Amino acid sequence: MTSLATLPVGPVRRVAFLGTPALAVPVLEALVHDGVDVAHVVTRADKRRGRGSELSPSPVKECARRLGIPVGHSVEELLDLHRRAPVDLGVVVAYGALVKPHVLRELPMVNIHVSLLPRWRGAAPIERALLAGDSETGVCIMQVEEGLDTGGVLATARMPIGRDTTADDIRSRLIADGTTLLLRQLRDGLSVPVPQEGEPTHAAKIEPDELRIDWSRSAEEISRLVRLGGAFTTHRGGRLKVHRAEVIDTESTHRGPGSVRVARDSIEIGAGIGAIRLIEVQPENKARMNASAWANGAKPGSDEVLGGG
């Protein structure tokens, strides 16, 4: 294990920030608003996006430019800057890459990780907690070390996951709570990291095919997938995204998986166990719409099965 640079003692006022996606932006903004001197920002390289494949900066890079903070793509460059004009701490929020051991030997870092470590180490902790049916999750301020999300924990906040809680709900709450924890740690001085205890689980990235609804699963499991965002099925060979749905039956097994029942304005779909009601869907190449509006146009028959091709 790499020997880590010692965490600073007392209030932390000068930091470097490492982050990339939109969820990291409010943390960077909060640091600046709170009077923390963000000396430098490191983010992932610009990516080609859109039909024109034009290079596009990350949301964090755009934010740093707007705030007038020097921004680059190289942790090595950050290390060189740190040697010439030291910062107290590196703050990592969804940077998207592991920080190399030799950097951590010179520059101590903490990370906002959106799970209750050691459960759900890895790239998709929010998504995996929701899919697994966890009753609660949380956010940790942890020391960055060589391993993936293995460092000691400085502070934790918890939140329940309800039957209607979406991944976006969790993300918004945990980033807000994590930001509060981070600012408190910087103002009051960093806590002593506590080693993680318990059996770790790995939060692998969500693969596209995992978002396909398997109607043989239980209604509760299907609901969790829909609340993740991006869930889809097929109808008459075309893709049908399911943006919102609710569980209406958790016990019956007599409905065929994927079977369609239209009752007034209620579009009910059978599952392996139970059933769900579609609320908002999006047919292929069309806008999002109320499920009843979709049914009025598509007129799904009682002999049809979603997901059948």
Placement of each model-derived feature along the sequence:
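Internal anion-binding site segments
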Residues: 2-8, 197-309
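N-terminal Rossmann-like dinucleotide-binding module
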Residues: 2-51
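Short, high-confidence coil segments that cap the C-terminus of an alpha-helix
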Residues: 12, 86-87
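A generic structural signal for well-ordered alpha-helical segments
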Residues: 31, 62-68, 134, 226
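Donor/substrate-binding cores of folate-linked one-carbon enzymes
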Residues: 33, 89-203
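N-terminal beta-loop-helix "entrance" segment that forms/cooperates
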Residues: 47-65
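Short acidic-hydrophobic, aromatic-tinged amphipathic segments that line or gate anion-handling sites
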Residues: 70-75
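Short amphipathic alpha-helix with an adjacent loop that forms part of the alpha/beta core around
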Residues: 77-86
